[in-house]
Amino acid sequence: MAGVLGMILAGGEGSRLRPLTESRSKPAVPFGGSYRLIDFALNNFVNADLMRIYVLTQFKSQSLFHHMKKGWNINGITDRFIDPIPAQMRTGKRWYEGTADAIYQNLRFMELSEPEQVCIFGSDHIYKMDIKQMLSFHKEKLAALTVSALRMPLAEASQFGVIEVDAEGRMVGFEEKPSAPKSIPGDPDFALVSMGNYIFEADVLFAELIEDADNENSSHDFGKDIIPKMFPRGDVFVYDFSQNRISGEKAEVYWRDVGTIDAYWQAHMDLLKTDAPFSLYNRKWPLHTYQPPLPPATFTDSDNGRVQIIDSLVCNGSYVRGSRIEKSVLGFRSNIASACDISESILLGDVKVGEGCVLRRVIVDKDVDIAPGTQIGVNLQEDKKIFHVSDDGIVVIPKGARVGY
């Protein structure tokens, strides 16, 4: 769509997702067997035919660059691009100091694109959104800035920017991560929170970024500085994400912050439900990604018993022999020997599980080799001596580990 530029913030360190982010940035973390977190933001743009996109990277970006080079290279098509941009350090030898600073340091790229509107989106949430619908709302309201928002249980709202709106959808209050969030009028158990997705009029954005960069007292963040400064003018509006409609979708809108191990695990379990709230199979909203050239998954019986695959996702290149896999996600090239019992677990790919292993509520990062007869997730006290165990008891095996040898 001419006149619209996408800026995707993909520099997140993802400290709460460690050890999955020890060797990769948060947007590069695998999800759902075949995907990376960045894919969902990119698909929201591409499926809305918004094909001029800069992806701003920062921490441990090599894995992300590799994925985008193989799966998202559309360069060569006139006026269409998806370009990853590493931190430029144009304002000094320093990393991005906040979300607004990340955009400001790439002001030159935006100006060269001559956009009318700039869409600034995050890259670490699981959801589908037709951005054209939000863009139409933005134009109808003649907004300087539009912020997408959703209802959030009041108990969880303090982790987000909390919004107040009037009857016309105009923002009349905003507080970033308040300790005592305000509830929605008439809906006392919920708050209206920012999704961290913004559409700016380009001239307004450029002026705000330049002014903010000159303010020594600013933290250079959209939620902490730019939005609180802008909304009292009356031209900041709020787009209700619950009104967004995706062709071919039956379920209500789905949005998950997967910033913790427990949330990441739960989002995978959501994929495996009979009526999954987030579907990977909507042909009218394809989820593009890089797919390595691999043969189909193979399932064979063994002398130890028949193979059983129940409520699970198994990716190409995987080989499961005479084992039981239930409510689990097996990434590319997962090799499961016979007599294993794996349940409610996530294998990120290139994982070898030896004969007779038991895995319960385990996340296994890439390139892991688990010795025959190993039990993980059965005795959490023992697991804590070796692995990271989350608050909800999810065991995480780090990338490249050799377990039980």
From Swiss-Prot:
<keyword id="KW-0808">Transferase</keyword>
<feature type="binding site">
    <location>
        <position position="161"/>
    </location>
    <ligand>
        <name>alpha-D-glucose 1-phosphate</name>
    </ligand>
</feature>
<keyword id="KW-0320">Glycogen biosynthesis</keyword>
<comment type="subunit">
    <text>Homotetramer.</text>
</comment>
<dbReference type="GO" id="GO:0008878">
    <property type="term" value="F:glucose-1-phosphate adenylyltransferase activity"/>
</dbReference>
<keyword id="KW-0067">ATP-binding</keyword>
<comment type="function">
    <text>Involved in the biosynthesis of ADP-glucose, a building block required for the elongation reactions to produce glycogen. Catalyzes the reaction between ATP and alpha-D-glucose 1-phosphate (G1P) to produce pyrophosphate and ADP-Glc.</text>
</comment>
<feature type="binding site">
    <location>
        <begin position="176"/>
        <end position="177"/>
    </location>
    <ligand>
        <name>alpha-D-glucose 1-phosphate</name>
    </ligand>
</feature>
<dbReference type="Pfam" id="PF00483">
    <property type="entry name" value="NTP_transferase"/>
</dbReference>
<feature type="binding site">
    <location>
        <position position="96"/>
    </location>
    <ligand>
        <name>alpha-D-glucose 1-phosphate</name>
    </ligand>
</feature>
<dbReference type="GO" id="GO:0005524">
    <property type="term" value="F:ATP binding"/>
</dbReference>
<keyword id="KW-0548">Nucleotidyltransferase</keyword>
<comment type="similarity">
    <text>Belongs to the bacterial/plant glucose-1-phosphate adenylyltransferase family.</text>
</comment>
<dbReference type="InterPro" id="IPR011004">
    <property type="entry name" value="Trimer_LpxA-like_sf"/>
</dbReference>
<dbReference type="InterPro" id="IPR011831">
    <property type="entry name" value="ADP-Glc_PPase"/>
</dbReference>
<comment type="pathway">
    <text>Glycan biosynthesis; glycogen biosynthesis.</text>
</comment>
<dbReference type="InterPro" id="IPR005835">
    <property type="entry name" value="NTP_transferase_dom"/>
</dbReference>
<dbReference type="Pfam" id="PF24894">
    <property type="entry name" value="Hexapep_GlmU"/>
</dbReference>
<keyword id="KW-0547">Nucleotide-binding</keyword>
<dbReference type="InterPro" id="IPR029044">
    <property type="entry name" value="Nucleotide-diphossugar_trans"/>
</dbReference>
<keyword id="KW-0119">Carbohydrate metabolism</keyword>
<protein>
    <recommendedName>
        <fullName>Glucose-1-phosphate adenylyltransferase 1</fullName>
        <ecNumber>2.7.7.27</ecNumber>
    </recommendedName>
</protein>
<keyword id="KW-0321">Glycogen metabolism</keyword>
<feature type="binding site">
    <location>
        <position position="194"/>
    </location>
    <ligand>
        <name>alpha-D-glucose 1-phosphate</name>
    </ligand>
</feature>
<dbReference type="GO" id="GO:0005978">
    <property type="term" value="P:glycogen biosynthetic process"/>
</dbReference>
<dbReference type="InterPro" id="IPR005836">
    <property type="entry name" value="ADP_Glu_pyroP_CS"/>
</dbReference>
<dbReference type="InterPro" id="IPR023049">
    <property type="entry name" value="GlgC_bac"/>
</dbReference>
<dbReference type="InterPro" id="IPR056818">
    <property type="entry name" value="GlmU/GlgC-like_hexapep"/>
</dbReference>
